């Protein structure tokens, strides 16, 4: 039996993200100097501006991307294959999610941490490449849009302000502005596959009595590949998305895991509508594709928000799926 070849694709445009105006709070990443100020003194090892870019580029390189390094090392160690990693757009090059880039890949993780402001959209050729991978038996594709905080398009100005204020107080993270919307590239792929999903909100997950993540609500009857075998929790990233299935998606996906919401946090409109958990991991039902498609948050592949032992078990389960 062979071992898996993993590829991780960051669907952002680095120039678009890095060039966001710091004087505008909404719809941009935190700059490194802002993160250092909010997290002081935890990140003082990154304080030297001669060594570390203190802007958004520094945050992306030394905080966000660094949090994915442990998964890449873990995957390389377990499979014996180096993880293939690309960013969609850097200052040096554009790397499409093409059939050429995917040669030999059987496990693809698409990190859709792209700001909606940058309007990243999958091209027809990229959609064809992902569909071809899903048409390969034994292949595994994760599409991972991050949170969508402050979507007030259907609200009046006053209602929108109140809604953004409620969302902000619910997640409680001062590093996150009142509107921070991600995931357009991932959603465009799902729309193109005829499986529309929307990443909604930024929900604060519940803690267990020991301070770790509260246990997941897992449906083992639909976990036909055992991806959650031995997995009890995900993480405590303070603003996680609910994955809403639209149209035919509701008949094409199973919800493998729901994550409890922190009901001690200030109320969120989603909670006030009756939910005490959110859909955290979706998987296509049998016969949707010869391969399998899953939807998760980007942070399931990072090491920065507690629950690490259980996350490692999840990674192990994914990486040890049989290769056909």
Task: Outline where the language-model segments fall.
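Short, surface-exposed patches at the edges or C-terminal ends of soluble domains, predominantly
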Residues: 1-324
